[in-house]
């Protein structure tokens, strides 16, 4: 059956139903479960260890992300969240390099300015990512904290600018004197932030990776609007959290369905 034929059939049915009597439509709430991406039944504890973090120096993505995830895990699932200091994996890798007599990875953009993060781009990040494959390191961390599920990864919170078409409502008065609104498009300069996060879930008993969740979100605002970096960070994390939480536990998507009566 073609799309046009199907449409004709639906239209005919609608006429038949209408001829038989009045048709009413109503919405009912529905919940669709999304199954957890990994089985965490063998764990009693979860450790948000710390992250490879960088991008902008407007906030500390490592500390902010660890605190936020711990808070969410305490309220949204049953594993005991371990209280511990948030570890900077950038500093951990640099200590290893120094102990081995090697130079710390150099930023891709040239010499590092004091106060600037060591990781600004994906290329900088690649110089540090080998730590995630070090099973013995993560196994040792697991032994220290009684074999928990370990959550780590990378978080880049970066400033960005763009130019493009944006839409906005425009007020006008019609021929009858009524005030109305219409959507207009215009060229605008935008600025904001991008959040590139990769959450890595590690078995603290073996040091092996169980699952990796890469996520990208961005928020853009008019260039004349002053939006605090921390506010934008939390706005972006609000978009990321549902997918993160769904890794560990079944989540429900709420919506509505229209029925004909």
Give, region by region, the residue ranges found by the protein language model.
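C-terminal/domain-edge helix-coil "capping" segments
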Residues: 22-44, 144-145, 157-261
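N-terminal segment of the mature soluble domain
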Residues: 45-159, 204, 208, 212, ...
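Generic alpha-helix detector with strongest preference for long hydrophobic helices that associate
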Residues: 3, 29, 50, 54, ...
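Bacterial N-terminal signal peptides that target proteins for export
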Residues: 1-10
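Cleavable N-terminal export/targeting peptides
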Residues: 11-15
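C-terminal motif of bacterial Sec signal peptides marking the signal peptidase cleavage site
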Residues: 17-21
